[in-house]
């Protein structure tokens, strides 16, 4: 890691993303503020725009090896464990093919300026091991790996938790009450030793899942989790949350990671993102590689055009909100005390002559506008 450097550029600085030109002091990878006192020969100058590190808060990277396999299939036909089309094909894929697909997926995220991502890693310890193998090829993006046990077994769950950042479950409907309680009980023991461990789960992704839960348990998925005293660190999707679901999430401080492009790819509807953003901490992800590119730029642009949420709020979802949800310390802003992990935007037509630079980043930037560069290759 570079111990001391000066970076001259224009920055989207602080939580309000104020456009600020100047020279940042960076010491041991941490932003110390701006300075006017320096020798020009000591300065690294970047003529584009420096923005906070982009974060993708929900992916399934293994299915990069089976892109577009399920065009016009229903969500259950595609991804419902254990017999969904995705799971059947991934079972047939060799480890080498899966690892190569993951490696290419990592390169794709890197080219899109994504510095961190959270992957729901299926196939137990094997799936985690394959992703870790692929990650050795790059310094960035860094992975938050949420493992998924192959079966509800104490030893299996513990082995997954030992080698991952937590658990990422497919949905409450896949488990009986006692199974959910066992999984969460084991998770809590690990969380007592490491508070950064995460427990996340898909919820209210499609109307059928909500109706199934209501018919079988007399409660929605969210209501059932809370009734079982299971409090996820976040839920994914929330496409069909009821008013009571929203109130329960709010009362229990449970964030939502929305994946709007994926929801429409699978034809399951749209989350009430404006309402969620007004009441909860909201992050964004891109979900399955088989259905979507992992581009957070595309996700932000799509969200703006569908919902007309303030561009500043959308950029927060992709940066500081995602960092908070994933418990990434001192990440997600260009600000004093934060890590010097940035996404670098070239001085291209996407941002030149902009009258609203945040809107231009959110709605115009694409892969070709990113410089594939990191200041902190050896970040811990």
Curated annotation (Swiss-Prot):
Coiled-coil stretches noted in the UniProt entry, renumbered to this chain: none
Single GO MF descriptor: hydrolase activity, acting on carbon-nitrogen (but not peptide) bonds
Family under the similarity heading: Belongs to the metallo-dependent hydrolases superfamily.
Protein name: Uncharacterized protein MJ0699
Organism: Methanocaldococcus jannaschii (strain ATCC 43067 / DSM 2661 / JAL-1 / JCM 10045 / NBRC 100440) (Methanococcus jannaschii)
Lineage, broadest ranks: Archaea, Methanobacteriati, Methanobacteriota, Methanomada group, Methanococci
């Amino acid at each position: 890691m570079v111990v001391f450097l000066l970076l001259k550029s224009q920055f989207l600085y602080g939580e309000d993303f104020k456009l600020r030109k100047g020279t940042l002091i960076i010491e041991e990878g941490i932003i110390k503020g701006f300075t006017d006192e320096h020798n020009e020969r000591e300065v690294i100058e970047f003529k584009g725009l420096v923005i906070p590190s982009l974060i993708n808060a929900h992916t399934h990277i293994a299915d990069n090896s089976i892109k577009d396999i399920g065009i016009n299939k229903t969500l259950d036909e595609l991804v419902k464990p254990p017999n969904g089309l995705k799971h059947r094909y991934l079972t047939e894929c060799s480890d080498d093919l899966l690892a190569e697909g993951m490696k290419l997926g990592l390169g794709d995220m890197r080219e899109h300026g994504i510095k961190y991502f959270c992957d729901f890693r299926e196939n137990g310890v094997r799936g985690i091991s394959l992703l870790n193998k692929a990650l050795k090829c790059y310094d960035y993006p860094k992975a938050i790996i949420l493992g998924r046990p192959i079966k509800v077994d104490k030893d299996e769950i513990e082995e997954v938790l030992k080698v991952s950042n937590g658990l990422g479950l497919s949905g409450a409907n896949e488990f009986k009450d006692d199974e959910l309680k066992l999984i969460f009980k084991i998770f809590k023991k690990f969380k007592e030793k490491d508070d950064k461990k995460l427990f996340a789960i898909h919820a209210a992704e499609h109307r059928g899942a909500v109706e199934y839960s209501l018919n079988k348990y007399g409660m929605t998925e969210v209501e059932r989790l809370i009734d079982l005293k299971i409090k996820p660190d976040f839920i994914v999707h929330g496409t069909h949350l009821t008013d009571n679901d929203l109130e329960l999430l709010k009362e229990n401080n449970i964030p939502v990671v929305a994946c709007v492009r994926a929801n429409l790819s699978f034809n399951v509807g749209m989350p009430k993102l404006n309402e969620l953003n007004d009441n909860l901490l909201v992050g964004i992800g891109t979900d399955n590689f088989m259905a979507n590119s992992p581009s957070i730029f595309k996700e932000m642009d799509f969200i703006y055009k569908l919902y007309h949420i303030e561009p500043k709020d959308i950029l927060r979802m992709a940066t500081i909100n995602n960092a908070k949800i994933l418990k990434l310390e001192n990440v997600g802003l260009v600000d004093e005390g934060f890590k010097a992990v940035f996404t670098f935007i070239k001085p291209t037509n996407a941002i030149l002559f902009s009258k609203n630079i945040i809107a231009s980043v959110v709605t115009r930037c694409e892969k070709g506008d990113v410089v594939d560069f990191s200041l902190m290759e050896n970040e811990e």
